[in-house]
Amino acid sequence: MAKDILGEAGLHFDELNKLRVLDPEVTQQTIELKEECKDFVDKIGQFQKIVGGLIELVDQLAKEAENEKMKAIGARNLLKSIAKQREAQQQQLQALIAEKKMQLERYRVEYEALCKVEAEQNEFIDQFIFQK
């Protein structure tokens, strides 16, 4: 009966028969809630560490991808440059070939003219020898 009167007044006895303001059941629930909150905070901390690690990993991969992209762009530009150099060299060689063909044609014409002169001179010599 004394417990009932004290209970109505908001006072309770715990398992050690100590006088408490809170109901022992509420006290137990409060302790459990406090432990659950502590576990939750610990898990949130672990989650943040994991997420932080993942963010660092993604950042590192992004940097590596950017570096590889820049290397690829550089290689592509180098290939374009080499292709342009080869094209210019090819044009120079074609111009040189055309020049050499023209020179060859001049030499051929000159050779034919010299052959004609030689034939005329040989004919003249032959006529001169026969007249004597």
Curated annotation (Swiss-Prot):
Component of the IFT complex B, at least composed of IFT20, IFT22, IFT25, IFT27, IFT46, IFT52, TRAF3IP1/IFT54, IFT57, IFT74, IFT80, IFT81, and IFT88. Interacts directly with IFT57 and KIF3B/Kinesin II subunit. Interacts with IFT88. Interacts with CEP83. Interacts with SPEF2 (via C-terminus). Interacts with CBL and CBLB. Interacts with TRIP11. Interacts with TTC21A. Interacts with SPATA1. Interacts with USH1G. Interacts with CCDC146. Interacts with CEP78; regulating IFT20 stability and localization. This is Intraflagellar transport protein 20 homolog. It comes from Homo sapiens. Disulfide bonds: none annotated. InterPro entries: FT20. GO terms for cellular component: acrosomal vesicle; centriole; centrosome; ciliary basal body; ciliary base; ciliary tip; cilium; cis-Golgi network. Keywords: Cell projection, Cilium, Cilium biogenesis/degradation, Coiled coil, Cytoplasm, Cytoplasmic vesicle, Cytoskeleton, Differentiation, Golgi apparatus, Spermatogenesis. Residues 74-114 form a coiled coil. GO terms for biological process: cardiac muscle cell differentiation; centrosome localization; cilium assembly; cochlea development; establishment of epithelial cell apical/basal polarity; establishment of planar polarity; inner ear receptor cell stereocilium organization; intraciliary anterograde transport. One of its GO terms (molecular function) is small GTPase binding. Its main location: Golgi. Pfam families: IFT20 (PF14931). Expressed in almost all tissues. Residues 70-132 are annotated as: IFT57-binding. It comes from the Eukaryota. It is found in: Golgi apparatus, cis-Golgi network; Cytoplasm, Cytoskeleton, Microtubule organizing center, Centrosome, Centriole; Cytoplasm, Cytoskeleton, Cilium basal body; Cell projection, Cilium. Part of intraflagellar transport (IFT) particles involved in ciliary process assembly. May play a role in the trafficking of ciliary membrane proteins from the Golgi complex to the cilium. Regulates the platelet-derived growth factor receptor-alpha (PDGFRA) signaling pathway. Required for protein stability of E3 ubiquitin ligases CBL and CBLB that mediate ubiquitination and internalization of PDGFRA for proper feedback inhibition of PDGFRA signaling. Essential for male fertility. Plays an important role in spermatogenesis, particularly spermiogenesis, when germ cells form flagella.
